[in-house]
């Protein structure tokens, strides 16, 4: 079962997978390889790794990217896995019947995986704006974000 969780941040998108039947230790082994990488690079790594835990994580990363493109309109080329965490879930306990009426306990561990994708294009635009402000030709008069001509040009604002 995959649940999606949203946060109020404008550049982050969450996807949460709960009760995935895999131990948290085995899932962390895969998650540590993709943390901090771009979306496309993470998908390639997950496709080529030979572990069974890669497939549910692959689906979760793909789902988070689909949330980003559908809900917030982000491009998949600008997405980076900023946060990926694995928490231990419930342990399902079963009894396996054995010879002579005995039984052995079987423990099936689960985990909860959270993937956070972040859009880096916002930060690139912000850095470009800061570089523009640091240019020597840019004086304090040019740094005003609101255009003075918009309010003083007449048009709709002066007519009543």
Curated annotation (Swiss-Prot):
Pfam families in the record: Ribosomal_L22 (PF00237)
Cell compartment(s), UniProt: Plastid, Chloroplast
Which is a GO BP term held by this UniProt record?
translation
Q: Where are the transmembrane segments?
A: none
Highest taxon of source: Eukaryota
Keyword Ion transport included in the entry's annotation: no
Write down the Gene3D superfamilies for this protein, in alphabetical order: Ribosomal protein L22/L17
Which cellular component, as a GO term, is one annotated location?
large ribosomal subunit
Provide the GO MF annotations for this entry: mRNA binding; rRNA binding; structural constituent of ribosome
Q: Does the keyword Transmembrane apply?
A: no
Keyword vocabulary terms for this entry? Chloroplast, Plastid, Ribonucleoprotein, Ribosomal protein, RNA-binding, rRNA-binding
Family, as annotated: Belongs to the universal ribosomal protein uL22 family.
What's the stated role of this polypeptide?
Answer: This protein binds specifically to 23S rRNA.
Quaternary structure, per UniProt, is: Part of the 50S ribosomal subunit.
Q: What name does UniProt use for this protein?
A: Large ribosomal subunit protein uL22c
Recorded source organism is Arabidopsis thaliana (Mouse-ear cress)
Top-level taxonomy? Eukaryota, Viridiplantae, Streptophyta, Embryophyta, Tracheophyta
């Amino acid at each position: 079962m995959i649940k999606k969780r949203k946060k109020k941040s404008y550049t982050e998108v969450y996807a949460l997978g709960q009760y995935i039947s895999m131990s948290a230790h085995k899932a962390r082994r895969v998650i540590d390889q993709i943390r901090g990488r771009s979306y496309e690079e993470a998908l390639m790594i997950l496709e080529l790794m030979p572990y069974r835990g890669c497939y549910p994580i692959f689906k979760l990363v793909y789902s988070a990217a689909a949330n980003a493109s559908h809900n917030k309109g982000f491009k998949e080329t600008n997405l980076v896995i900023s946060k990926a965490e694995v928490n231990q879930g419930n342990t399902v306990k079963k009894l396996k019947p054995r010879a002579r009426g005995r039984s052995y306990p079987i423990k099936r561990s689960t985990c909860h995986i959270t993937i956070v994708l972040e859009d880096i294009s916002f930060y690139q635009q912000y850095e470009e704006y800061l570089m523009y402000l640091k240019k020597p030709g840019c004086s304090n008069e040019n740094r005003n974000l609101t255009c003075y001509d918009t309010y003083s040009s007449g048009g709709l604002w002066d007519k009543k």
